[in-house]
């Protein structure tokens, strides 16, 4: 719904000509790190707060004042836009520090494009050069700092499908990953729990919006969408500094670059776009620190590709990305975001699974017809939601119908089939381009390589979670024992492992050698030597008679683990002739 608030916009700019960023405070309160910002506009004042919860694995006291001032000030610069938009003042006065001309251009661009939807739905006509100007009370410009960061990762979790795909792929590839959540809720915590991540292991920011802003919204002051992902970007720098982690891996896909309104540079997802990501990386490197590596891990992928990967994970019943139902932690089933999620997953999940996840078959709900047409590109704009491209939506629907022709009788799919473009998409059977990683991204080469082996990495993530809580002993150090050790060190590089063998010469050689196994504890295979072990990984060279002391429930093997992971994908081939030929043929077919 487009409102005509252009008159109100002009009146408020005249009545409230200057918005002030007075300053900020921060400190440790009851063990947590708190920061409060002070904004003023006329008779109105706002004091939004962030509380970073104390955790055992990091410290708030390792950063000096210069580092904290720099990071906190910049969080305030993005926080203020949520309050400025109520008045749209002509000037923003920054009282404690100054910005050079390039910094001003950076912030003006974020504010203008990040508020593109806000201006559009309020019927406000303005341009990037005239909508706001900066003024300063002081001349000091904060200098960039160096930070002592390690080669480890942070993955922000939003509760939807994208962030858990990033989490599992990076985790399965052996990366040291911590999750980060702003204002934890059911879905975000459930996704972490499903990944065997406890609440104590999560980086948390409790962000509080000043209640007076909500009062102004109710009174009719200007209101609308703000660039939350830009807030996440600047806040993530703080938790990265606190936890000494260099890499901040967002989960914004290539589809986020598409404009929401045809013919206009208005993008609901601007702060998820590659343009914003590149601008942010440049700004951080020059004005904050070159030590941070902020990037979107899923940037090379389409929504369809992500949905396909997600369908192979075990988060279907805990993920939720419905904004309308977020407070109740549900899929509302009545909004464009729910319909898009249903559509994009429909080629990859069975109908009964989708009904269990969303509470109903959304393709049968005629009340969603308008949203369907908007998502498919019928009309001047897509819904103002984080949804995929028009092309992806149409390809997903066509894939669903080809996979299940009977579904064409469902109300929304019947409607889609009557659109003039439907035949084109149904005839387009070559969709490989939707599942080919793109080259325009900021990933490190080692992280980009993960997509070439995504399925095996997903299975490695499952295996890692299956074994991460165990104290493991590998029984036997022949060929299979060494391959087991290499696999476990690949997926769990910091796990303490034990290798046991009945050959004392093998044990003694490895106990004294300075080789790649120097982090492994080697022991002689005998009873009473493994009281702390919870899982024994047996190899073929160790006879059962030699390990009678091992309880059966604690015993496993490579074959056992393989079948636990791949039982649904295993085809057994036997016979005296043609096994290798048949195997090769089946491999090519399936």
Ranges and model annotations:
Residues 1-152, 164, 169-209, 244, ...:
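RNA-binding accessory domains that recognize and position tRNA/RNA substrates
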Residues 156-159, 471-486:
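Glycine-rich adenosine-cofactor-binding loop
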Residues 172-177, 490-496:
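Conserved S-adenosyl-L-methionine
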Residues 486-489, 528-533, 540-590:
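Phosphate-binding loop of NTP-binding sites
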Residues 2-37, 44, 286, 290, ...:
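ATP/NTP-dependent adenylation/nucleotidyl-transfer catalytic domains that generate, transfer
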Residues 184-186, 479, 503-506:
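Helix N-cap at the beta1-alpha1 junction of Rossmann-like dinucleotide-binding domains, i.e.
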Residues 55-64, 183-317:
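ATP-dependent adenylate-handling ligase core
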Residues 495-511:
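NAD(P)-binding Rossmann-fold cofactor-contacting core
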